[in-house]
Amino acid sequence: VGMKPSDVNMIVLAPPVAVPAYQRNQIDGYYVWDVWGARLEASGAKLVQRAVDDGFPSSSIWTMTKEFLAANPDAAARFIATLNQASTEMRASLAKGGADAEVVYAAIGKANGVDRAAAAELLKAQPPATLQNLLSNDSPLSFVSKTGLLAQVIQQGRIAVQAEAIKQEPANPQDLLAPRSLLEAAMKVK
């Protein structure tokens, strides 16, 4: 929503390079799978969105540095609004059924390396999450409920310690999530 490809300079970095690049403020954001996501969060990256929020059953996450969020709140809100629009459109296509739903099933199937039936099951189990879901107290993906994403961040911290990706669990896991105000700002983007 209001974001063009030219607004973002995308580069490919291997996870072992991205974590130090984050720590040196050489990159503003990164898309990665866990356990690297846990390492980035432990380095001070803010969790912006998990791939599961868009219907992908993985632990991949979108992150942005605190500095980027502070310096570019409008860009961050537009990015999140764009992800929200994609989720909303996917949900609408699934609800409409027919050819519209088949496009979503095909995309999810291709992204996950599964057939159409498996893609349908994945989407049934985890429909694309919208900002309304993320701001709801009732959603397991809630940014505002202690049983939502915060519980997942705590769990990922434990997993990362067990995998020896980080030395200790985050002291303040809530600080690893994007602030509620960012999600609310994204809802206002037209």
What residues fall within each predicted segment?
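A local structural motif
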Residues: 1-13, 24-27, 46, 166-170
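A short, structure-level motif marking secondary-structure boundaries and short turns
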Residues: 2-4, 20-23, 140-143
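Residue-level "edge-of-site" marker
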Residues: 11, 35, 53, 122, ...
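A short alpha-helix capping/helix-coil boundary motif
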Residues: 14-17, 44, 133-137
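Pocket-lining segment of extracytoplasmic ligand-binding domains
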Residues: 17-113
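Short, solvent-exposed polar/charged micro-motifs at secondary-structure junctions
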Residues: 22, 129-132, 179-186
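Secondary-structure end/capping motifs
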Residues: 70-165
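Conserved C-terminal helix/tail region of periplasmic/extracytoplasmic solute-binding proteins
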Residues: 150-190
